[in-house]
Amino acid sequence: MATAAAAGAGQEKQLAPTLLSFFIYNPKLGPKEGEEEKKILFYHPNEVEKNEKIRNVGLCEAIVQFTRTFSPTKPAKSLHTQKNRQFFHEPEENFWMVMVVRNPIIEKHKDGKPVYEYQEEELLDKVYSSVLQQCYSMYKLFNGTFLKAMEDGGVKVLKERLEKFFHRYLQTLHLQSCDLLDVFCGISFFPLDKMTYLKIQSFINRMEESLNIVKYTAFLYNDQLIWSGLEQDDMRILYKYLTTSLFPRHMEPELAGRDSPIRAEMPGNLQHYGRFLTGPLNLNDPEAKCRFPKIFVNTDDTYEELHLIVYKAMSAAVCFMIDASIPPTLEFCRKLDSIVGPQLTVLASDICEQYNINKRISGAEKEPQFKFIYFNHMNLAEKSTIHMRKTPSVSLASVHPDLMKILGDINSDFSRVDEDEEIIVKAMSDYWVVGKKSDQRELYVILNQKNANLIEVNEEVKKLCATQFNNIFFLD
């Protein structure tokens, strides 16, 4: 939905970018004249008249064909028009996804009538292309590939799966909140000392031994990843689902430290705080349903279908993934609860205490003069002091949108070349913005020092690298 913000006395309104349409088609499904509708596998909004759907899909086909003559392997990525921008993605051969986003608008009043000015240069291709790619990755995580659906039951099954998934998922796309973090789609890692990390490793080994049907495990604390047995690309999209969808739905007042009283009303009156975030709500109910969401991983080679069991105690969450051919019983869920619950409760307390001790040792940080985003392409590690909270519905970036756009522009420049480089920009608002790319790592810094010169800005960034990333090599 468009958010309108009145801008002062001029009665200007700023209308955010919005999703105009989203569709998926396969040109091979309706090659003959009169069969064009067969190509369309999904179209949002559905109430659009049939001929308009066919016309829009036909136009996209023509654009793809035209651009293929210049770039056979990488045809159309995006199309810019005055009012909107179209993004194209071919995740599987001949399956095309298209997302049409309306450009932001400034609404002014002239002679008592509204006048609309489209902001054609505001949207960043890289950001919204990444959002479109994530739409596919999220679909694939819960449904497998488009081809798999075709093999399971032809076009009919694929259409049903697309409708069921995207009808809900598109409602969670808040395009006005998208920024550089959507390009990275990285993972925030929880900082840990070696001793506590070994405790967690030992806990995972014990759990996998006790619950021998567990194939993969992932461990998170405070919505940050500590350990994962999954492939990186599968974990990055599962992490996005957990932190932006599942965990926010189960928010509760978190308990700190081991001194908190144990809740006596826990299922089975066990002395722990463990509970299932997916699966049975009440283990004492003999009728309780043990249904877990299914996920698909390693779709490029072994193609594994798994049940996703997410279990949480205080701020610690564990994902157990078991083969989908083994249906989890209520008995198994009770066993998991009795084994994992008490140990995870103690472990969560230990992590919390250790984290607080480390925080005290490092001392209270005063508000620094800079904010930064860091991303490592090798392990997908992401760190941002710019975002206070990043969920699908809200991106509380603590800097002005103009600065976020500069960060995106620098990132686009970086992606065009393979060499390491550094870019320094002075914004109109007198902020300095620095981008550093070195050895598969990227660092973006925003400095609030309007009287500084280039040399001083460079020194500040060097200091930041020394304090925040002392074990990371950045080229000077």
UniProtKB/Swiss-Prot annotation:
Record flagged with keyword Metal-binding: no
Subcellular locations according to the entry: Lysosome membrane
This protein's UniProt keywords: Lysosome, Membrane
Gene Ontology terms describing biological process: vesicle-mediated transport
Record's keyword annotation contains Chaperone: no
InterPro entries reported in the protein's UniProt record: Ccz1, CCZ1/INTU/HSP4_longin_1, CCZ1/INTU/HSP4_longin_3, CCZ1/INTU_longin_2
GO CC annotations, alphabetized: intracellular membrane-bounded organelle; lysosomal membrane; Mon1-Ccz1 complex
Primary location group: membrane
Family, per entry: Belongs to the CCZ1 family.
UniProt protein name: Vacuolar fusion protein CCZ1 homolog
Source organism of the structure: Gallus gallus (Chicken)
Gene giving rise to this polypeptide: CCZ1
